[in-house]
Amino acid sequence: MKTQLYKGSSKILYSAEEDFLLIMAFSDNVTLESGEIIEISGKGVLNNNISSFLMDKLEMNGIENHFIEKINMREQLIQYVEVFPVQVIISSVACGRFVKEFGMDEGYVFDKPIIDFKVRSREFKYPIVNEYQILNFGWLTRDEIKAVKEQALRIYDFLSGLFIGVGIRLVECKLEFGRVFNGEESIIMLTDEISPDNCRLWHINSNEKLGFELLENEPNKAFESYQLIADRLKEK
């Protein structure tokens, strides 16, 4: 019998039969900015399908990640990764905090994607943290920061092209990385998920928002947009 190891707002981690493997289950829950938890029936199934598909595509293109295989509609088998305490946010278009904090016009296209680091802490509301702080806190080494940034940009470039091919624009995404040890050596590996829960996705022609951006104000339309994204990716 599998043992629950962790329960977040949208995913649950369970033990697996083999060492260094875990089962990740996608729930229908989502936590709004207000802290309210709502349920979007069927969202977990779609996110499992979307993330499995994208992680598999990344692996085929030389990006190592924790995904091993999809087990069923809601669960996937993953490799254990010692996750870094920071998230990597890559933005190619002014959105979210760039509009709220800097007064930029939403939709302004940056010359190059911008990389931000945020602390992985809901308690402290995911504050921005810079590279000097990350180094001084001992969270990552200088070489690890460099490698994470290079991988993040490579992933973003690949995903952007893939989404453009199905008429969707990847505006911003949140990635998580960690270490996998092989004896005394370690490699950096992509972990968590890639889905409409952690990617800002807009319709390429109309800039209509898709995915999690609808959850706050138009939750009744959210599932339809998740389904649209999943259906578009099936074409690839």
UniProtKB/Swiss-Prot annotation:
The keyword Lipid metabolism is assigned to this record: no
A Pfam family of this chain: SAICAR_synt
Reaction catalyzed: 5-amino-1-(5-phospho-D-ribosyl)imidazole-4-carboxylate + L-aspartate + ATP = (2S)-2-[5-amino-1-(5-phospho-beta-D-ribosyl)imidazole-4-carboxamido]succinate + ADP + phosphate + 2 H(+)
Domain of life of the native organism: Bacteria
Keywords linked to the UniProt accession: ATP-binding, Ligase, Nucleotide-binding, Purine biosynthesis
GO CC term (a single one): cytosol
Gene3D superfamilies in the cross-refs: ATP-grasp fold, B domain, Phosphorylase Kinase, domain 1
Broad enzyme group: ligase
GO molecular function, one term: ATP binding
Assigned protein family: Belongs to the SAICAR synthetase family.
Protein name, UniProt field: Phosphoribosylaminoimidazole-succinocarboxamide synthase
Originating organism: Rickettsia felis (strain ATCC VR-1525 / URRWXCal2)
